[in-house]
Amino acid sequence: MIKQVEKNAKQKMEKVLEATKHDLNTVRTGRARPSLVENIMVDYYGTQTPIQQMAKVVAPEARQLVIEPWDKSVIESIEKAILKSNLGLNPSNDGNVIRINIPQLTEERRKELVKVAHEKAEKGRIAIRNIRREANDELKEMEKNSEISEDNYHRGLDMIQELTDTYIDKIDKMLEDKEQDIMEV
């Protein structure tokens, strides 16, 4: 029974880790990466749709992104969505594709982006801790209902804490890598 609680917690923590990784990938660095804009939502005939589902996004150069929509009529909608995304990007379109030149980041902007990355990582840590709390509550309930012994309860708490520490360390490592990426000139 404890193994099941641990397994459930691990699955949930894995999902949080993936979501945090995805969130951190949306934080801009000095290089052009398709992931920077792929998940920006665009109003596509009344439906919010991510850019990646309506266009091909490539980085032909280190500081340039090219977005080639499959339906040319949405070019202006994509352009507006990018401008509204607060990423500090200035798209330009030639009627067929949207080109985005990624400007060099200033020191001040880098520090702002590091703060944003810290906030996203902290959200991930909080989610991991909430999963730990849920698992601990589940174990406490099992012990209260005499489904597990007190020793097994404490063993379970220790396992969940180890799991929590492992996943928080993974998030910290991702944050550290992202920070280095952002601060790299």
UniProtKB/Swiss-Prot annotation:
Keywords per UniProt: Cytoplasm, Protein biosynthesis
GO terms of biological process kind: translational termination
InterPro entries noted in UniProt: Ribosome_recyc_fac, Ribosome_recyc_fac_dom, RRF_sf
Main localization (coarse): cytoplasm
Annotated transmembrane regions: none
Entry GO MF terms: ribosomal large subunit binding
Subcellular location(s) of the protein: Cytoplasm
Pfam families: RRF
Family note: Belongs to the RRF family.
General function of this protein: Responsible for the release of ribosomes from messenger RNA at the termination of protein biosynthesis. May increase the efficiency of translation by recycling ribosomes from one round of translation to another.
Name of the protein described by the UniProt record: Ribosome-recycling factor
UniProt gene name: frr
